[in-house]
C-alpha cells in the first residue's frame, strides 16, 4: 500500500513537472563555455596588419629599407620612398606611406626620434611574436564631444531669449532669469565668454570684410587699367590699318599715273585725251622716248639727229610758217626743231647773230604757239630760204 502511494507520488510529480513551464535548455552553459573559448582564440590571433608588419620588419632581405634597431625594441624605415613604392603594394595593396603611419598610430605605435622614421611599441619586439596578440586597436569616439558641444550650443540660445518692452529696450523675462540663476554655476562662466567669442568672431569677420573690400578695389583698378590698355591697343591697330591702306592706295595711284604718263608719251596722244596733270619740273620736259619728236613733226635730213626743246613730248623749236598768198595765219601749230646751241647751219655768223631766239608764251600744248617777234622770224626765214636776199 505504501509502495503504491509512493509510485503515485512519483507519477504525480512527473505529471506536475510535465504540466509545468519548460526549464531553460541544458546546453546553455556549454554555449557560454564555447563563447569564452572563441573569445580567447580571437585574442590569441593578432590582426593581419600587425602580422604583415612583423613579417616585413623581420625579413632580412629588406634590411636596407626597413629593419629592427640594434636591441630589437623598435624598427626603422630607412628609405620611405622605396618602402612605399616597392614593399607597401606587396603587403598592404597600397603605396601610401602616410596611411601606413596612421595605421601604426591607431595600434599604439609611437615615433621615437623626429629626424627619422623609427617606431616602437611595448609588445612589438624582435623574437617575441606571441606578444602581437596583446596589441589592440584604439577606440576612437569623436561623436561624444561633438554631441556635447551641440548640446551646449543649443542650451545657450534657450538660456538667453530676448524680449522687447514698450519703449523698445531689450530685457530678460523673470522666468528666464530664474532659469539662468537656478541652473548650475557653469552657465554664468560660459555666458560672459559668449560675447567675447562673438566679439572675436566679429573682429575676425570685420578683418575679412576689410580684406575683401581692399581686394575688390584692387580688382576694379586692374579692370580699369586693362580696359584702357585694350582701348589703346585697338586704337593703335586701327591707326596702323588705316596707314597701311592709305599707303597701298597711294602706291596704286602712283603706279597707275606713271603707266598712263608713259603710254601717252610713247604713243604721241594729245593732251586733250589724257587727264590734265600738274605741271612737271623743268627736267621732266624732256621726252621719255626718243621717237616722240619725230612722231610729232617731221624734220629735215640735216636736222634729224639734233636735239630740240620739247614741252609735254611735243617739239617747240620750229617757227611758224606763212602761206604764199599772205593770207590769214594758220591756226595749226607748225614748228621745226631748233638746235640747242642756237647756231644755224648753212649761213654765216652775222646772220646767226641777227637771229633772235624765239620767245613763247606758256600756253597749253593743244593751242597754236605764236611768236612775239614773228616779223624777225619771217625775215630770218626768208633769208634762210633765199627769197628776200638783197
From Swiss-Prot:
Residues 215-244 are annotated as: Hydrophobic repeat HR-A/B. InterPro entries: HSF_DNA-bd (IPR000232), WH-like_DNA-bd_sf (IPR036388), WH_DNA-bd_sf (IPR036390). Residues 206-237 form a coiled coil. One of its GO terms (biological process) is regulation of transcription by RNA polymerase II. Exhibits temperature-dependent phosphorylation. Keywords: Coiled coil, DNA-binding, Nucleus, Phosphoprotein, Stress response, Transcription, Transcription regulation. It comes from the Eukaryota. PROSITE patterns: HSF_DOMAIN. It is found in: Nucleus. A motif (Nuclear localization signal) lies at residues 318-322. SUPFAM superfamilies: Winged helix' DNA-binding domain (SSF46785). One of its GO terms (molecular function) is DNA-binding transcription factor activity. Transcriptional regulator that specifically binds DNA of heat shock promoter elements (HSE). Belongs to the HSF family. Class B subfamily. PANTHER family: HEAT SHOCK TRANSCRIPTION FACTOR (PTHR10015), HEAT STRESS TRANSCRIPTION FACTOR B-2B (PTHR10015:SF169). Homotrimer. This is Heat stress transcription factor B-2b. The gene is HSFB2B.
Amino acid at each position: 500500500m505504501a509502495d503504491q502511494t509512493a509510485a503515485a507520488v512519483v507519477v504525480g510529480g512527473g505529471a506536475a513537472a510535465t504540466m509545468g513551464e519548460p526549464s531553460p535548455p541544458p546546453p546553455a552553459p556549454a554555449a557560454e563555455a564555447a563563447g569564452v573559448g572563441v573569445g580567447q582564440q580571437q585574442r590569441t590571433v593578432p590582426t593581419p596588419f600587425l602580422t604583415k608588419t612583423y613579417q616585413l620588419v623581420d625579413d632580412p632581405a629588406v634590411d636596407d629599407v626597413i629593419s629592427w634597431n640594434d636591441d630589437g625594441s623598435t624598427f626603422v624605415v630607412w628609405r620611405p620612398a622605396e618602402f612605399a613604392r616597392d614593399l607597401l603594394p606587396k603587403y598592404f595593396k597600397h603605396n601610401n606611406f602616410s596611411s601606413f603611419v596612421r595605421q601604426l598610430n591607431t595600434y599604439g605605435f609611437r615615433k621615437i626620434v623626429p629626424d627619422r622614421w623609427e617606431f616602437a611599441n611595448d609588445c612589438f619586439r624582435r623574437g617575441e611574436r606571441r606578444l602581437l596578440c596583446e596589441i589592440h586597436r584604439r577606440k576612437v569616439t569623436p561623436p561624444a564631444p561633438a554631441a556635447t558641444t551641440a548640446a551646449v550650443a543649443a542650451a545657450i540660445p534657450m538660456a538667453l531669449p530676448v524680449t522687447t518692452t514698450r519703449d523698445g529696450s531689450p530685457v530678460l523675462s523673470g522666468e528666464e532669469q530664474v532659469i539662468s540663476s537656478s541652473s548650475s554655476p557653469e552657465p554664468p562662466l560660459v555666458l560672459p565668454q559668449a560675447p567675447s567669442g562673438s566679439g572675436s568672431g566679429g573682429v575676425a569677420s570685420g578683418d575679412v570684410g576689410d580684406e575683401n573690400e581692399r581686394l575688390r578695389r584692387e580688382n576694379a583698378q586692374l579692370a580699369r587699367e586693362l580696359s584702357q590698355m585694350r582701348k589703346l591697343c585697338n586704337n593703335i591697330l586701327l591707326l596702323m590699318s588705316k596707314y597701311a591702306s592709305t599707303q597701298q592706295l597711294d602706291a596704286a595711284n602712283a603706279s597707275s599715273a606713271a603707266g598712263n604718263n608713259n603710254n601717252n608719251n610713247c604713243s604721241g596722244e594729245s593732251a586733250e585725251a589724257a587727264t590734265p596733270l600738274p605741271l612737271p619740273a623743268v627736267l621732266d620736259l624732256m621726252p621719255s622716248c626718243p621717237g616722240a619728236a619725230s612722231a610729232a613733226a617731221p624734220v629735215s635730213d640735216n636736222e634729224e639727229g639734233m636735239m630740240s626743246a620739247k614741252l609735254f613730248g611735243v617739239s617747240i623749236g620750229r617757227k611758224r610758217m606763212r602761206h604764199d598768198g599772205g593770207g590769214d595765219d594758220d591756226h595749226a601749230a607748225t614748228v621745226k626743231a631748233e638746235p640747242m646751241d642756237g647756231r644755224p647751219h648753212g649761213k654765216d655768223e652775222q646772220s646767226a647773230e641777227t637771229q633772235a631766239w624765239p620767245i613763247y608764251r606758256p600756253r597749253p600744248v593743244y593751242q597754236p604757239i605764236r611768236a612775239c617777234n614773228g616779223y624777225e622770224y619771217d625775215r630770218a626765214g626768208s633769208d634762210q630760204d633765199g627769197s628776200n636776199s638783197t
